[in-house]
Amino acid sequence: MFSAQKPIYGNGAGVNMGGGGPSTNNPGSMSMPGVPTSMGPGMNQQIPSGGPMLMGNTPNNNNSNENGENNGNNGNNGGNDANATRNNPNMVNNRGAVHALDDPNVYHWICQLTYGPQKEQALLELGRKREQFDDLAVVLWSSFGVMTSLLNEIISVYPMLQPQMLSNNLSNRVCNALVLLQCVASHPETKHLFLQAHIPLFLFPFLNTTSRQRTFEYLRLTSLGVIGALVKNDSQDVITFLLRTDIVPLCLRIMESSSELSKTVAIFILQKILLDDVGLQYICATLERFYAVTNVLKDMVEHLTVSTPPGRLLKHIIRCYLRLSDDLEARRLLKIVLPAKLRDNTFTEVLRDDVGSKRCLAQLLLTLNEETS
């Protein structure tokens, strides 16, 4: 039931949805409220002389450095890593999972990331290995200084979040750091530690940018990917955390004005929030929040055309409306604000091969007592 209470969201995206999250209106600010100074295990320890302390058994340092340098010089170690994995049975456990620390190159690049001269290359190489090793996220989180190094990469670019100041190289470097954060955010053993450390708050200055330059689009898209990894597995703890931030208004603004790919990830995050009972209750708690969401969804529908295939956007839009209709008061209002293009046959041909979306749209119209043809 909607109430007349004032919204408790901030207006980070230009929508009146209340406050409670960190201030994201000044991307150049180096201070992120609510973020603890210690972001992971061992952050306040002294750096050991022999290299970073890693989770589990570490390979021989000499072999690690030698192999890492050789592969770095070759510039293409993907095939070599795969061959090494196949030829070394010790790298595979009884269940067939490959351990990251059994690969000496992982150790080498983590050493480089924490205090070596090849940090930029380390970000790239470790990002390439995230699909190869299931436990890379645990290694990244548990290894001395790694999370601090990743956060330093992110914080260092805050003063550059202005047009003409953010270079392609710097944007790519930060995106590579964000890819590793996404790896940590998506792993079941590190996801909640990632949240407890409030690390997602460090991404909000990137989400709060509005420039359409490619460098900024990449930052927004990769930052959205980290949030998307958090919400992917329907954890109420994640949703509850995000609802205390400005993520909803930021996603709404991106859905209004960013690239189609960024819009798709942003609406995916919104859909995941709505699918959670806490998220649905939150959005439907006030008229301001409800209309902030439905107005953006309506504008997105109006900009979709049959000549330009809407891709996954239409699919997510329909599912957001369908979930909103589960709230009785929202259902009554949806009968008034649902776009005409979803009531008629505008997207019939577009949805012809999408059985799931057709079914969701039919269910939505039936729920709203609409006639379907």
Swiss-Prot record:
Gene Ontology cellular-component annotations: CCR4-NOT core complex; nucleus; P-body
Keyword field contains Electron transport: no
Region (Disordered): 1-91
InterPro entries per UniProt: ARM-like, ARM-type_fold, CNOT9
GO biological process: negative regulation of translation; nuclear-transcribed mRNA poly(A) tail shortening; positive regulation of transcription elongation by RNA polymerase II
Cellular location(s): Cytoplasm; Nucleus
Gly residues composition bias: residue spans: 11-22
Task performed by this protein: Acts as a component of the CCR4-NOT core complex, which in the nucleus seems to be a general transcription factor, and in the cytoplasm the major mRNA deadenylase involved in mRNA turnover.
UniProt cross-references to PANTHER family, sorted A to Z: CCR4-NOT TRANSCRIPTION COMPLEX SUBUNIT 9
Protein name, UniProt field: Protein CAF40
Species per Swiss-Prot/TrEMBL record: Saccharomyces cerevisiae (strain ATCC 204508 / S288c) (Baker's yeast)
Lineage, highest ranks first: Eukaryota, Fungi, Dikarya, Ascomycota, Saccharomycotina
Gene designation per UniProt: CAF40
